[in-house]
């Protein structure tokens, strides 16, 4: 079987924007992309992330929602719920995030930041469930659900576990938002995105990785069909200045996903483009894997 480099490693081989600034105050103006500016604001100024998962539609209670989307989870372990309108006909994509126990859930909610946060006992994201449903009249009509938490469905996690010997490549440690751009991967198939990531902390800074996962509906189940790095940001402290401030080395890489007109097995090929040097990588549908592969 042909062996591929881990997806993150492939991403980091691509050229990145890099610059050095003279002190911490100069970092925000050196960051090129809004993702990095938000990371800096959260890390250095304590800014709260936006509600990337939205809110349940008016009239839909948390109790009713989690009874369908995650029937085997204990309601006492709930951290977060949310939903966003998707397309027409009253369709929504919703989430429910659970901790392993009530104490961990209460601790997570105490420091609530609108994300499905890290489970510090295993270094992974807490249990995030997805559901697609219709809400009209008002009544919940089920369409599809993930059945398992995303950290078990994620192709990114599987690749990170099985293929990587790079210590910087890890399973996702948190989920941040729904990405409902119109990812039409086939004429009759619309996918939706979930964004998450993980970070590395250094004595003089850190690195942050954002991953886009695309999910689609197959029968009444939600399956992961694509996962890859879409943003990388690092801030590493450098030399000391005479005035006691310290230089900072900033690096960024950002990628966008394009749907190509060419098809493989009925699905449009995906092109991930590096915005820095316009290099790209093509992903095609694999019938055997039932997802995209490089």
Predicted stretch roles:
Residues 152-159, 163-177, 235-237:
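Repeat-based blade/solenoid architectures
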Residues 123-135, 208-219:
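Beta-propeller blade signature
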Residues 133-148, 217-227:
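Surface-exposed loop/turn elements that mediate protein-protein interactions on large endomembrane-trafficking
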Residues 107-124, 201-207:
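Short consensus segments that form the blades of beta-propeller domains
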Residues 4-13:
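Sec-dependent N-terminal signal peptides
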Residues 18-87, 205-294:
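Acidic, small-residue rich beta-repeat scaffolds with periodic aromatic anchors
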Residues 87-100, 184-199, 262-271:
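Acidic/hydrophobic-patterned starts of short beta strands in beta-sheet-rich repeat architectures
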Residues 170-208, 212:
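Eukaryote-skewed repeat-based solenoidal scaffolds used as protein-protein interaction platforms
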């Amino acid at each position: 079987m042909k062996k591929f480099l881990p997806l993150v490693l492939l991403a980091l081989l691509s050229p990145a924007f890099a610059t050095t600034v003279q002190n911490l105050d100069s970092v925000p103006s050196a960051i090129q992309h809004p993702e990095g500016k938000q990371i800096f604001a959260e890390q250095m100024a304590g800014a709260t992330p936006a509600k990337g998962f939205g809110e349940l539609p008016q009239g839909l209670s948390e109790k009713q929602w989690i009874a369908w989307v995650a029937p085997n989870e204990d309601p006492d372990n709930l951290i977060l719920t949310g939903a966003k309108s998707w397309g027409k006909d009253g369709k929504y994509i919703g989430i429910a995030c659970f901790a392993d126990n009530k104490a961990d859930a209460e601790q997570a909610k105490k420091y609530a930041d609108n994300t499905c946060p890290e489970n510090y006992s295993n270094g992974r994201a807490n249990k995030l469930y997805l559901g697609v449903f219709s809400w009209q009249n008002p009544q919940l009509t089920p369409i599809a659900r993930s059945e398992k938490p995303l950290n078990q469905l994620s192709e990114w996690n599987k690749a990170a576990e099985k293929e990587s010997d790079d210590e910087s490549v890890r399973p996702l440690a948190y989920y941040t938002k729904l990405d409902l751009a119109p990812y039409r991967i086939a004429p009759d198939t619309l996918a939706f995105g979930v964004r998450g990531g993980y970070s590395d902390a250094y004595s003089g800074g850190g690195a942050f990785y954002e991953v886009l996962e695309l999910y689609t509906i197959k029968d009444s189940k939600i399956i992961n069909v694509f996962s890859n790095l879409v943003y990388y940001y690092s801030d590493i402290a450098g030399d000391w200045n005479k005035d006691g401030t310290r230089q900072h080395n900033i690096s960024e890489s950002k990628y966008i996903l394009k749907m190509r007109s060419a098809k493989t097995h009925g699905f449009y090929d995906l092109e991930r483009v590096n915005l820095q040097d316009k290099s790209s990588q093509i992903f095609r549908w694999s019938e055997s894997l039932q997802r995209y592969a490089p």
